Amino acid sequence: MAIDLMRRHGYDGVSVDAIVEAAGIGRTTFFRYFGTKPGVIWYAFDDTIARLEAELRDAPGDLGAMEAVRRAVVSSTRSAVYDSDVWLERFDLLDSSPSLRVGASEHWELWKRAIAGHLARHTGGSATDATPMAAAGACQGVFVAELRGRLSGDGRDAFVERLDRSLAPVTGVLDQLFRTDG
């Protein structure tokens, strides 16, 4: 409901009071669930990060590091877009609202660190090392490009398939950086 209001009136054009009134809840309930107005936008992405971390943690040991990343990004994103009718639309709001972009780097940094952490565990390095962070940044670049390149009316399947196709060559090239087989 809040996302629909924000899509119609713009993020800055919708107050917390308007959201709680439309939802029929109190301000206390709103803040208990979301913490802040930007939390309405970001909570689903934060859940996706947790899912991504779990998928990377549970990846088969014989799978290449970057192949595990590609599969985990696609799988966690697929779950997210099917768990919410407006998951993808949140990113339209992020791109169109300067006040939301202010906090975006914090959330994207968590997304990148999930990937960099997996890559570091795979090679015995640190998640803050340049190579894992650069590889995670490349994956983020693909992800953001696909979010921004999404056509209106694109179905969820089309988005997830395009994300997978776009990640494949990038993760394929980066895989050689994380091979441990000599």
PLM regions and their residue ranges:
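An amphipathic alpha-helix adjacent to DNA-recognition modules
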Residues: I3, D12-G13, E21-G24, Y33-R70, ...
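Residues that scaffold, gate, or flank divalent-cation-dependent active/transport sites
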Residues: W87
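Hydrophobic alpha-helical bundle segments that form small-molecule/ligand-binding pockets
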Residues: Y82, S97, E109-A136
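Hydrophobic/aromatic residues within well-ordered alpha-helical segments
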Residues: T48, V73, H107-W111, I115, ...
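Small/polar (Gly/Ser/Thr/Ala-rich) solvent-exposed segments
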Residues: A104
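Residues within helix-turn-helix
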Residues: D17, T28
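Hydrophobic/aromatic-rich alpha-helical bundle segments in the mid-to-C-terminal region
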Residues: H122-A168
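C-terminal peripheral helix-coil segments that are non-catalytic and often amphipathic
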Residues: G117, G155-G182
